[in-house]
């Protein structure tokens, strides 16, 4: 069969006509085989969206079989606020083929911490075991009020030589399928659950929490709060890189860690209290300009 990108999308995405079609092989399978695959897919989705149990299920094992593959998109939606703070959005996504499933269970001696465990599944979606991967912590700040996994991603501002300049204080995250990133990867879940923080991250009285990043989906955070955004005060004008790193302490088990990091080049200019940023283009995508908050001051 031949599939094609329609004209208006070719124009919008600047795709050449010669590159806008592709031939794919279509296999017609017997109903019995198709039903088996559908049952396995549904079983995997049920496993992902089931509420977290109050205790560990299964046995501790060394990871085997399919694993998730965490990757970082280049930082985006970059702007300067109040002439001083470099805001950005960051997305870490799972290229699969396995979902990332992390359960947290409340500690008895510290009510603000949960012990976190990553679950592993075979190709049919059946759980085969788990392994400890750190902790979750209760974040009672306004705008949060949910459980954060503490070793999911990290953000840094690096100089032109990619040496550390500023480190974001945002170190803990609630995992949720906030964005569809690439549903063409093998075993992508086209209809993920837990797509917002309210359904994924538990409450203050939760005994257990299940946080999931499905195959093909990403978790996006906007860094605009002081301490999470980068403070440009005292920094020289020039070239910098916004670093986004997935699984920074490598506590999570995944198929590869070689693709965890991304770097977005930015150029800082202006004077103290009136800084500006120019963002380097990535690939063929042209981002719409973002008005710096300081422009109205």
Regions found by a protein language model. Give the residues of each.
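Extracellular or exported targeting regions of proteins
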Residues: 2-3
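Extracellular/luminal regions of secreted and cell-surface proteins that mediate adhesion/ECM remodeling
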Residues: 8-297
């Amino acid at each position: 069969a031949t599939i094609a990108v329609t004209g208006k999308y070719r124009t919008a995405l600047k795709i050449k006509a010669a590159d806008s079609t592709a031939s794919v092989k279509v296999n017609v399978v017997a109903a019995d085989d198709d039903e088996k695959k559908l049952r396995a897919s549904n079983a995997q989705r049920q496993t992902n969206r089931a509420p977290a149990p109050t205790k560990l299920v299964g046995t501790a094992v060394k990871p085997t079989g399919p694993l998730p593959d965490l990757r970082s998109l280049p930082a985006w939606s970059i702007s300067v606020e109040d002439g001083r703070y470099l805001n950005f959005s960051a997305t870490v996504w799972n290229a699969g083929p396995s979902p990332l499933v992390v359960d947290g269970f409340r500690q008895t001696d510290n009510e603000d911490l949960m012990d976190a465990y990553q679950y592993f599944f075979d190709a049919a979606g059946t759980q085969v075991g788990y392994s400890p991967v750190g902790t979750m912590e209760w974040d009672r700040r306004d705008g949060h009020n949910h459980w954060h996994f503490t070793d999911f991603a990290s953000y840094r501002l690096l100089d032109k030589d990619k040496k550390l300049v500023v480190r974001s204080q945002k170190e803990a995250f609630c995992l949720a399928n906030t964005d569809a990133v690439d549903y063409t990867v093998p075993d992508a879940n086209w209809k993920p659950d837990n797509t917002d923080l309210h359904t994924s991250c538990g409450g203050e009285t939760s005994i257990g929490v299940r946080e999931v990043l499905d195959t093909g989906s990403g978790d996006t955070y906007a860094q605009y709060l002081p301490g999470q955004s980068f403070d440009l005060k005292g920094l020289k004008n020039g070239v910098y890189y916004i670093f986004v790193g997935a699984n920074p302490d490598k506590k999570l088990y995944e198929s590869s860690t070689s693709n965890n990091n991304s770097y977005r080049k930015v150029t800082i200019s202006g004077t103290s209290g009136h800084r500006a940023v120019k963002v380097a283009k990535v690939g063929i995508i042209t981002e719409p300009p973002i008005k710096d908050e300081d422009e109205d001051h």
